[in-house]
């Protein structure tokens, strides 16, 4: 990567990436056009998302076809890059002037088959056999926690329910998570520190000097009746031209209402709400944050967010983390990464933000 901005160099390190589309390496083509790259790595069946913002002032960029597959590797110049998976182009937007192209892609599309409703009953079997059958049906490799494989399943029905929904329900019953990452069906206990192939992950240590900012939240699960998150579009330049193309869906298309430039999203009821301090860039992000915090409150977990000054492409969701330099109860807790956001931009270089959680039952506060 050869950004012209010296602001990208942090401690004599320069961000680097490798991008291919439909098997063709376009890293060099994008080298001087990249205005921003954001990769969000989510836990569970929520699709990972890749956003690319490119300079098209000369009008020479060819629009990618809908459904094209993008592969990404990310890291630092002079060091091995870390593969971050394959993503299907879901939405493209061209705006101007000045002309720029935004490409939005989501983790390669396993969702159509996993979202097909089925009728199935299992009787006198094990968790391992159930997960194995579903993995085989979708041509996925299986990464199953050994402590879950032999758990007995006396009887369970899948009634007019998709495999994705059924796996999530089964995972909740056994205190596990279900996810698809890079062609692997992952079914493991939360916070067990397993990779997508089921191998143990080393505990990552993060010190306070590694971060630009942090936020810790601990609340009584019964104290709040809802969560509110606010959004405000902060990047709304005047548009002379705007073209948006979305992938065709099998479901009936409905007219999309224009999104308000600002607002609040409430999950739960408004008798006694927890208001998130952060203002999000759009309604979708605010909705996701509110729902995530509400689920945390219902599960009874403490949450901790960190903005790292230097990006860590080697981090993945479900990695176990130890932190130091904060309050003692925070340092003593065993954290797990639930969401990762990698960002590359001319202004801030390569940074990584982490969302971590720990069960309140495992958290002691004097």
Regions found by a protein language model. Give the residues of each.
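Short, compositionally biased
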Residues: 86-95, 120, 192-194, 334-346
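Assembly/oligomerization scaffold segments
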Residues: 1-112
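An acidic/polar, Gly/Ser/Thr-rich interaction patch typically located in mid-to-C-terminal regions
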Residues: 33, 37-65, 211-366
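Short glycine/serine/proline-enriched coil/turn segments at secondary-structure junctions
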Residues: 79-81, 95-97, 179, 186, ...
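Short acidic, glycine/proline-rich loop/turn micro-motifs
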Residues: 114-118
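Amphipathic, non-transmembrane alpha-helical segments in extracytoplasmic/periplasmic proteins
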Residues: 49-53, 105, 119-143, 158-181, ...
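Short beta-strand-centered interaction patches in the first periplasmic/extracellular domains
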Residues: 2-5, 100-109, 146-215, 221
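Conserved "cap/hinge" positions at secondary-structure junctions
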Residues: 74-76, 189, 325
């Amino acid at each position: 990567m050869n950004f012209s901005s010296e602001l990208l160099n942090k401690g004599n390190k320069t961000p680097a990436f490798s991008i291919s589309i439909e098997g063709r390496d376009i890293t060099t083509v994008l080298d001087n056009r990249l205005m921003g790259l954001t990769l969000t790595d989510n836990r569970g069946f929520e699709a990972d998302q890749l956003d690319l913002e490119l300079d098209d002032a000369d009008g020479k960029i060819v629009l990618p076809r809908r459904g094209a597959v993008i592969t990404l590797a990310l890291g630092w110049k002079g060091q091995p890059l870390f593969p971050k998976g394959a993503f299907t182009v879901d939405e493209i937007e061209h705006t101007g002037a000045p002309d720029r192209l935004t490409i939005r892609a989501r983790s390669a599309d396993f969702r159509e088959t996993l979202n097909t409703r089925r009728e199935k009953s299992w009787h006198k079997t094990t968790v391992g056999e159930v997960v194995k059958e579903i993995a085989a049906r979708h041509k996925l490799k299986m990464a199953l926690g050994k402590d879950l494989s032999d758990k007995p399943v006396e009887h369970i029905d899948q009634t007019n329910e998709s495999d994705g929904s059924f796996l999530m329900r089964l995972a909740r019953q056994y205190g596990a998570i279900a996810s698809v990452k890079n062609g692997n069906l992952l079914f493991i206990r939360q916070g067990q520190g397993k990779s997508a192939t089921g191998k143990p992950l080393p505990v990552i240590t993060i010190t306070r000097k590694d971060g630009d900012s942090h936020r810790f939240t601990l609340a009584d699960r019964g104290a709040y009746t809802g969560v509110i998150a606010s959004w405000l579009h902060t990047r709304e330049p005047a548009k002379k031209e705007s073209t948006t193309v979305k992938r065709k869906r099998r479901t009936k298309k409905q007219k999309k209402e224009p999104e308000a430039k600002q607002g609040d999203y409430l999950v739960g009821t408004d008798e006694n709400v927890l208001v998130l301090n952060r203002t999000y860039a759009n309604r979708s992000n605010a909705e996701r944050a509110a729902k995530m915090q509400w689920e945390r409150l219902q599960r009874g977990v403490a949450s901790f967010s960190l903005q790292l000054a230097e990006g860590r492409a080697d981090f993945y969701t479900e990695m176990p983390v130890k932190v130091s330099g904060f309050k003692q109860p925070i340092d003593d807790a065993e954290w797990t990464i639930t969401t990762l956001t990698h960002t590359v931009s001319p202004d801030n270089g390569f940074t990584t933000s982490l969302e971590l959680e720990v069960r309140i039952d495992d958290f002691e506060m004097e």
